[in-house]
């Protein structure tokens, strides 16, 4: 019998690959078409965000968070704003909390819509992205009407939100909800029962619950494996404890379960949005939307025209910024991709001493190796789509 010299084949997947979602470079070791090893090379989008934040005042650091997970920008600002508020010990008025929750859920829908539809595109379905982007476009307009920008909003500031929502905008968001559920049903009917979509996702990228905890997973990745762990329920922040919503969990921990969870979560987000809209139009219709002590949030323009103190105050807040008491704090929100945390160290000056950003996608990407082992080459793209990776937050 002749001896065969077996040599595994190494290929590069990315960084300019259409399924690589940005600037991912994977070095794959293949035995025929079976994946033996996956080696993610990251850092191609590294911008030194954490170091840059140390040279900026607390207010100037806000826009950096928009540019991390840039498909759902306001959710990142939320974690940072909460960290600064914890250090300052300030409370947000209820109207400000409702506006924050409303826009956090809009961000969740933005992210899940993009993920579910591009995952469908990765496995060959071309219609869902067109429908998904149609709905995302409407949500981007809501972002723009609240903050003036479609993506990089810088709308959640420490102390509340930057400006109030007009009543008409709140009504328009309420009117968007039901037609969206119908559009979601269309995408659902197209994908959920689709034979090819199921063949490409069922039993691919299976993760057990123990492996989830060992690899530091969070968000949809743990819920897909059967843990009902959601920071909005486990460690409620803002006014989530007063809102009604369910947490979907999967039982197989595969790509398909994670897809189903994202679909259900979009429906739950709409449910939360409806509750926020109702309250913003009834009991929280008027009242302050940001902290009123005047130490953190700059005074209103009208006040500055009348009062010299307000003008001085405004000037101080935008040049020097406010001083945050020394200490360290960790604040986390349930971002669309998982637990997005900000560990903030203050030395009592007007600039953060250290700001560590805990991006959920970073922990998920490192598990590519053990999730893809033994699968076909084509399944690498499916697993990658299911992880929901955005490089802004992975490379920071």
UniProtKB/Swiss-Prot annotation:
UniProt-annotated location(s): Cell inner membrane
EC number: 7.1.1.-
Protein's membrane topology: Peripheral membrane protein
Reaction(s) this enzyme catalyzes, per UniProt: a quinone + NADH + 5 H(+)(in) = a quinol + NAD(+) + 4 H(+)(out)
Superkingdom of source: Bacteria
GO molecular function: NAD binding; NADH:ubiquinone reductase (non-electrogenic) activity; quinone binding
Pfam families assigned: Complex1_49kDa (PF00346)
Enzyme class: translocase
GO cellular component: plasma membrane
KW Transport (keyword) present: yes
InterPro entries, per the entry: NADH_Q_OxRdtase_suD, NADH_UbQ_OxRdtase_49kDa_CS, NDH1_su_D/H, NiFe-Hase_large
Keyword Glycoprotein part of the UniProt annotation: no
Record's keyword terms, sorted: Cell inner membrane, Cell membrane, Membrane, NAD, Quinone, Translocase, Transport, Ubiquinone
PROSITE patterns reported in the protein's UniProt record: COMPLEX1_49K (PS00535)
Function: NDH-1 shuttles electrons from NADH, via FMN and iron-sulfur (Fe-S) centers, to quinones in the respiratory chain. The immediate electron acceptor for the enzyme in this species is believed to be ubiquinone. Couples the redox reaction to proton translocation (for every two electrons transferred, four hydrogen ions are translocated across the cytoplasmic membrane), and thus conserves the redox energy in a proton gradient.
Family: Belongs to the complex I 49 kDa subunit family.
Entries under PANTHER family matching the protein: NADH DEHYDROGENASE [UBIQUINONE] IRON-SULFUR PROTEIN 2, MITOCHONDRIAL, NADH-UBIQUINONE OXIDOREDUCTASE 49 KDA SUBUNIT
Complex and partners: NDH-1 is composed of 14 different subunits. Subunits NuoB, C, D, E, F, and G constitute the peripheral sector of the complex.
Descriptive protein name: NADH-quinone oxidoreductase subunit D
Organism: Rhizobium johnstonii (strain DSM 114642 / LMG 32736 / 3841)
Encoding gene (name): nuoD
């Amino acid at each position: 019998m002749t001896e065969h010299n077996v040599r595994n084949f190494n290929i590069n997947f990315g960084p300019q690959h259409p399924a690589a979602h940005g600037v991912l470079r994977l070095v794959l070791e293949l035995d025929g078409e079976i994946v033996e090893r996956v080696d993610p090379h990251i850092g191609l989008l590294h911008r030194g965000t954490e170091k840059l934040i140390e040279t900026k005042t607390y207010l100037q650091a806000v826009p950096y968070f928009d540019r991390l997970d840039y498909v759902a920008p306001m959710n990142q600002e939320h974690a940072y704003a909460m960290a600064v508020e914890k250090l300052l010990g300030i409370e947000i008025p209820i109207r400000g909390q409702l506006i924050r929750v409303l826009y956090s859920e809009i961000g969740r829908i933005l992210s899940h819509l993009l993920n579910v539809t591009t995952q469908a595109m990765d496995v060959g379905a071309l219609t869902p992205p067109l429908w998904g982007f149609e709905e995302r476009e409407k949500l981007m307009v809501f972002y723009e009407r609240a903050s003036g920008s479609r993506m990089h909003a810088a709308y959640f500031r420490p102390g509340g939100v930057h400006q109030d929502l007009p009543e008409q905008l709140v009504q328009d968001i309420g009117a968007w909800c039901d037609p969206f559920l119908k559009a979601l049903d269309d995408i659902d009917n197209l994908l959920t029962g689709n034979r090819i979509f199921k063949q490409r996702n069922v039993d691919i990228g299976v993760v057990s619950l123990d492996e989830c905890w060992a690899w530091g997973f969070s968000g949809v990745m743990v819920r897909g494996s059967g843990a009902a762990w959601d920071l909005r329920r486990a460690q409620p922040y803002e006014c989530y404890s007063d809102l009604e919503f369910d947490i979907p969990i999967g039982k197989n921990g595969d790509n398909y379960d994670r897809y189903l969870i994202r679909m259900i979560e979009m429906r739950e987000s709409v449910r939360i949005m409806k509750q926020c809209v109702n309250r913003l139009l009834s009991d929280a219709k008027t009242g302050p939307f940001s902290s009123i002590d005047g130490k953190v949030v700059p005074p209103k323009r009208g006040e500055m025209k009348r009062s010299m103190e307000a003008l001085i105050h405004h000037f101080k807040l935008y040049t020097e910024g406010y001083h945050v008491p020394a200490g360290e704090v960790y604040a986390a929100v349930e971002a669309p991709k998982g637990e997005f945390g900000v560990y903030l160290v203050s030395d009592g000056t007007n600039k953060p001493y250290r700001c560590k950003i805990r991006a959920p996608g970073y922990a998920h990407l490192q598990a590519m190796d053990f999730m893809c082992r033994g699968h076909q080459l084509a399944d690498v793209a499916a697993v990658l789509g299911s992880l929901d990776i955005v490089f802004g937050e992975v490379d920071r």
